[in-house]
From Swiss-Prot:
Places the protein is found: Cytoplasm
Molecular function per GO: (4S)-4-hydroxy-2-oxoglutarate aldolase activity; (R,S)-4-hydroxy-2-oxoglutarate aldolase activity; 2-dehydro-3-deoxy-phosphogluconate aldolase activity; aldehyde-lyase activity
Domain of life: Bacteria
Active-site residues annotated for this sequence: 45, 133
Protein's pathway: Carbohydrate acid metabolism; 2-dehydro-3-deoxy-D-gluconate degradation; D-glyceraldehyde 3-phosphate and pyruvate from 2-dehydro-3-deoxy-D-gluconate: step 2/2
Record-linked InterPro entries: Aldlse_KDPG_KHG, Aldolase_TIM, KDPG/KHG_AS_1, KDPG/KHG_AS_2
Lineage of source species: Bacteria, Pseudomonadati, Pseudomonadota, Gammaproteobacteria, Pasteurellales
GO biological process, one term: Entner-Doudoroff pathway through 6-phosphogluconate
Catalytic reactions on record: 2-dehydro-3-deoxy-6-phospho-D-gluconate = D-glyceraldehyde 3-phosphate + pyruvate
Subunit relationships: Homotrimer.
One cellular-component annotation, GO: cytoplasm
Primary role: Involved in the degradation of glucose via the Entner-Doudoroff pathway. Catalyzes the reversible, stereospecific retro-aldol cleavage of 2-keto-3-deoxy-6-phosphogluconate (KDPG) to pyruvate and D-glyceraldehyde-3-phosphate.
Protein name as annotated: 2-dehydro-3-deoxy-phosphogluconate aldolase
PANTHER family associated with the record: 2-DEHYDRO-3-DEOXY-6-PHOSPHOGALACTONATE ALDOLASE-RELATED (PTHR30246:SF1), 2-KETO-3-DEOXY-6-PHOSPHOGLUCONATE ALDOLASE (PTHR30246)
Length: 212
C-alpha cells in the first residue's frame, strides 16, 4: 500500500526511532529486519550509500510488507525512480534539492528533505513541505537550534538525524514537533557485516527502553 505524508508521520510518531542502514550485501536486510521487528521496530531507512540499496528495499518490501521503508541519502532523479520502483514508502534526502522535491511530488512519492537553516526551511514550505529532516542534527546546533527555528516555523514536523544517541535522544523527543529520530549506532555496518544480530537486538532493546 502507499502512504500519505501524514500517515507516514503518524507511524513515525508511534515508532520514535528510525534505523538508518547502510548495507554492502542486500541479503543482509532480511535477518536485520527480523531482528528489528522482534525487538519492536518495523521501520528501516535504507540508504543509497551503496549499490545494494535498491535490491535491499525490494527484498524487504517483498518479504516484510508490514515494514515502513524509507529510501535514504537519495541525491539524484534516477535514485528517486529506483526507490519508488523498488517499493520504498518515502524518500529521505540529506539536503533540499527543489528538482528532487518536485519530481517526488509529480510521482506522488512522499519526501522528507534535509534542512538546517531558515533559507532551506522557507524553500521547503514554499513547495508545500512541512515534514523535514534536520541534518546533520548535532553539528547544526542540535536541540537548541531546533527550538530556535521552531519560533518562526512552528508548523514544522521534524526528523533529526546525525549525532543522536542514547545520551541525547530523549532531549530531542521531548520537543513536540519532533516525530522521530534517525540513528545508526544500533545498526552499525560492522555489526551487519559480521551478522551480529544478537548485539544489534540488544542495542535496539536498549534504545527502545530509553524512549518508552
Amino acid at each position: 500500500m502507499s502512504y500519505t505524508t501524514q500517515q507516514i508521520i503518524e507511524k513515525l510518531r508511534e515508532l520514535k526511532i528510525v534505523p538508518v542502514i547502510a548495507l554492502d550485501n542486500a541479503d543482509d536486510i532480511l535477518p536485520l529486519a527480523d531482528t528489528l521487528a522482534k525487538n519492536g521496530l518495523s521501520v528501516a531507512e535504507i540508504t543509497f550509500r551503496s549499490e545494494a540499496a535498491a535490491d535491499a528495499i525490494r527484498l524487504l518490501r517483498a518479504n516484510r510488507p508490514d515494514f515502513l521503508i524509507a529510501a535514504g541519502t537519495v541525491l539524484t532523479a534516477e535514485q528517486v525512480v529506483l526507490a519508488k520502483s523498488s517499493g520504498a514508502d518515502f524518500v529521505v534526502t540529506p539536503g533540499l534539492n527543489p528538482k528532487i522535491v518536485k519530481l517526488c511530488q509529480d510521482l506522488n512519492f512522499p519526501i522528507t528533505p534535509g534542512v538546517n537553516n531558515p533559507m532551506a526551511i522557507e524553500i521547503a514550505l514554499e513547495m508545500g513541505i512541512s515534514a523535514v529532516k534536520f541534518f546533520p542534527a548535532e553539528a547544526s546546533g542540535g536541540v537548541k537550534m531546533i527550538k530556535a527555528l521552531l519560533g518562526p516555523y512552528a508548523q514544522l514536523q521534524i526528523m533529526p538525524t546525525g549525532g543522536i544517541g542514547l545520551h541525547n535522544i530523549r532531549d530531542y523527543l521531548a520537543i513536540p514537533n519532533i516525530v522521530a529520530c534517525g540513528g545508526s549506532w544500533f545498526v552499525e555496518k560492522k555489526l551487519i557485516q559480521s551478522n551480529n544480530w544478537d548485539e544489534i537486538g540488544r542495542l535496539v532493546r536498549e534504545v527502545i527502553d530509553i524512549i518508552k
